Each structure stands twice: as C-alpha cells, then as structure tokens.
Regions:
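Amphipathic alpha-helical dimerization/coiled-coil segments
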Residues: 86-113
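N-terminal helix-turn-helix DNA-binding core of bacterial DNA-binding proteins
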Residues: 5-48
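Intrinsically disordered, low-complexity serine/threonine- and proline-rich regulatory segments
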Residues: 1-7, 91
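Basic amphipathic alpha-helical segments that dock to polyanions
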Residues: 49-56
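Beta-hairpin "wing" of winged helix-turn-helix
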Residues: 57-74, 79
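Accessory beta->alpha helical hairpin/"wing" motif in late/C-terminal subdomains of nucleic-acid enzymes
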Residues: 80-84
Length: 113
C-alpha cells in the first residue's frame, strides 16, 4: 500500500496557495514546499501543478514574475495577491470545518446489531 495520500478534488489550489503564502516560489519550489509542509505525504505531479498555477494566475489569486532561482536560472516566481490571501483564509476555514465534521463522524462507535 502506498503511504502517500491521494489528493481530494479541489485541494490542489488550496495547497498551492498555502505553499506560496509562506513566500514567493518558483514551480519546483512549490512542489518541494508542499512535500515539506505535508511531511512528504502529498506529492503533486508537475503537470497538475502547472495547470493549477496557470488557473490561479488567471483567477487573480497569484501573481507571476520572472526572477533568478537559487541555481542562477531564470524562473517564474509566484506570490499571493490580496484576493489569493482572502481565498486561502476562506478555503482553510472551510476545510478545517469539514475535517472536524469527518473526524467526528469517524470517531462514532458503530451500533451493535
């Protein structure tokens, strides 16, 4: 059995926003940051990541600008916009409520038949 968790639909954007909220990053840095903040339980495929980044920039939740990476290569860096910070807060609150509800439901003991 694979120890890495499968992403639930709708979580990729939230994870990208969270990773970038800790500071501007290029795409590969975002992949590494998501792995780091999830204890390496979540690994995102590059294709999915770049589709997500494009979508978030188009929605005005991320801003992209060119810069130089730590290995002196030209890279596109992503940072949160004000709208991105707002969305991150809203989605985090929503996921926390959902996680609490699911944990509560799973902790209930089944009735004896």
């Amino acid at each position: 059995m694979n120890d890495q968790a499968q992403l639930l639909p709708g979580t990729l954007d939230l994870l990208i926003l969270r990773a970038v909220s800790l500071g501007p990053l290029h795409g590969y840095g975002i992949l590494l940051r998501i792995g780091q903040i999830s204890g390496n339980a979540l690994l995102i495929e590059q294709g999915a990541l770049y589709h997500g980044l494009f979508r978030l920039v188009r929605q005005g939740l991320l801003k992209a600008s060119w810069g130089t990476s730590e290995n002196n290569r030209r890279a596109k860096f992503y940072s949160l916009t004000a709208a991105g910070r707002k969305r991150l807060r809203e989605e985090t609150d929503s996921w926390n409520r959902l996680a609490t509800a699911i944990a509560s439901a799973l902790s209930q003991q089944p009735e004896e038949a």
